[in-house]
C-alpha cells in the first residue's frame, strides 16, 4: 500500500467535499477547486475524513494513489488557508511595480519585462523588491512564482536576480588576479 495514499485527509469544518463521476470538488471560504480522477482511483468521505483507495495494484496505479491523495489534500488546505510563495529581487536598479493586472520588472536589461497576473492568483508587493504570490491552487502558485523567478535567475557570483525567500544561492569565487 502507498505510504502517502493510505493516510486519511482531515476535512476542516468550513470545507465541503462533493464527489461525482470521478470528479472531486472541494469548496471552502476562499473558493472552489475540482480534480478529475483516473478510473482506477476511488474516493469516499467517512467521518470528516477523505479516504483515497485504488482498485488495482500495478506500479502506475500505486503511483497515482499517492499523487491523488496529495492533490486532494492540497485542495482542502488551499480552500481553507491558501498558499503563498515569497520572492526577493536583489541587484542594483532591479525593481518591480504593479499596474492593474500586470507586473513590470526592471532587471538590468535594456527593456522592461511585463508579466500578466493570471486569474485566481493574488500578488502583493512589499516595497519594490519583495513579491508575495498567493492563491488557493498550490500548483498554480508555484508555477507563477517559478515563471517570475525565471525572468532573472540568480547568478552565482554576486547573487543578483529574483530568488525565493528560503532559497540559498551557491556562490562561486570570481577570477583571481595574475600571479607573479
Curated annotation (Swiss-Prot):
It comes from the Bacteria. Transmembrane segments: none annotated. The keyword Transmembrane does not apply. It comes from Borrelia turicatae (strain 91E135). Belongs to the universal ribosomal protein uL6 family. One of its GO terms (biological process) is cytoplasmic translation. HAMAP family: Ribosomal_uL6_B (MF_01365_B). This is Large ribosomal subunit protein uL6. This protein binds to the 23S rRNA, and is important in its secondary structure. It is located near the subunit interface in the base of the L7/L12 stalk, and near the tRNA binding site of the peptidyltransferase center. InterPro entries: Ribosomal_uL6-like (IPR000702), Ribosomal_uL6-like_a/b-dom_sf (IPR036789), Ribosomal_uL6_a/b-dom (IPR020040), Ribosomal_uL6_bac-type (IPR019906), Ribosomal_uL6_CS (IPR002358).
